[in-house]
A protein has these predicted regions:
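Non-heme Fe(II) oxygenase metal-center motifs and adjacent flexible, charged/small-residue loops
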Residues: 1-164
Length: 164
């Protein structure tokens, strides 16, 4: 992972392997990963088949400007006629294509403010994914739980290819 500057000091302590099949109705509901234990970066390898990662964020009372479809009148935006309109929205969802054999790093606002999900409709073929997590600052050197963090890292480095 040292090929990518964003992952230069990434030291995973957890690997989660996921195997999804459309026949089983596989999906991941929208969620935020724990921020107390897991660190700033979530790293995921999407293998075997393409899919779509859905990122959503609640935006109560927000106005979303949309381009008006053809046949709709132009809207008055700040005194100027523009081909857009305002729509009150409860949630914003962004669809991110994940090609086969792609690497995804969630960090910053994408990690802490946007929920991520894989909807059933986006599992069209068998999908295998490996997600890696690092420890949060609390469990790293200088953190309140650094001794426990060192033990967790030691255990993770002892993995020999068999589930514990």
């Amino acid at each position: 992972m040292g090929l990518y500057p964003i992952l230069e000091d990434f030291r995973p302590v957890e690997q989660c392997n996921l195997d999804y099949c459309p026949e089983r109705g596989s999906a991941i509901d929208p969620h935020l990963d724990d921020a107390w234990l897991w660190g700033e970066r979530l790293v995921s390898l999407n293998l075997l088949s393409p899919t779509v990662l859905s990122m959503s964020r609640e935006a109560p009372g927000s106005l979303l400007l949309c381009l008006a479809p053809s046949g709709f009148p132009e809207a008055l935006v700040e005194g100027v006629m523009a081909p857009s309109r305002s729509v009150l929205c409860q949630e914003v969802e962004v669809a991110i294509p994940l090609p086969r054999r792609s690497l995804l790093v969630l960090t910053g606002a994408a990690r802490h403010q946007w929920k991520h999900a894989i909807h059933r409709r986006h599992i069209e073929a068998r999908r295998v994914c490996a997600t890696f997590r690092e420890l949060s600052a609390e469990f790293r050197p200088g953190g309140r739980q650094q001794e426990l963090g060192q033990e967790l890292l030691r255990i993770s480095l002892s993995f020999q290819g068999r589930p514990m």
